[in-house]
Amino acid sequence: LKPAGYVSGALGKWHLGLTEEYHAINRGFDEFYGFMGRGAHPYFDHSDMSHPIYRGLTPIKEEGYLTTRITEEAVDFIGRHKDEPFFLYVAYNAVHAPPEAPEEDIKQVTGDETRDTLMAMIKHLDNGVGEIVNALKKHFLFDNTLLIFLTDNGGSGTMHANNAPLRGFKQMDYEGGIHVPFIVSWPAELEGGKKCEVPMWSI
């Protein structure tokens, strides 16, 4: 996209290699905030500098709930690049293990106790996506922005997910492990409310 004049950013989980050679910055992105692969990353404790949060190629000491920080970085990126074409890849760590959420979010959940933290994590992620959408609307970019929301696998049994009516969980070939949401929004070009039956694969 660079030859077409786009600025690009990658935020969150970079699951495409662990060495500097495969870092997002060395794969064409202009900006990066997040961590390198290895599956999970703690949501609150970012002190392990052997598995750090990066800004660009530089490991940084960070504080705050990771889902919140990724959202804040996304909103900031949109504000800084609102007057030029951009591509922003936002890969939330949520709702991957470990099950960690802000206490105030957990208190708002009144479901099965074993699922309260997972539900709070989903709520926090949902709010984050809403903040990104609101940032696009604030800068009058929403209608002409292609927005894609998807996940890489079904819910995890160890995280007390419930994929019903689909059978199975993450790491299974049943539909509960691989049949996931894929939502596209582009008001200027696509009519809303439609359903596409063509299979999609996100990897």
What kind of region is each of these model predictions?
Residues 1-203:
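Formylglycine-dependent sulfatase
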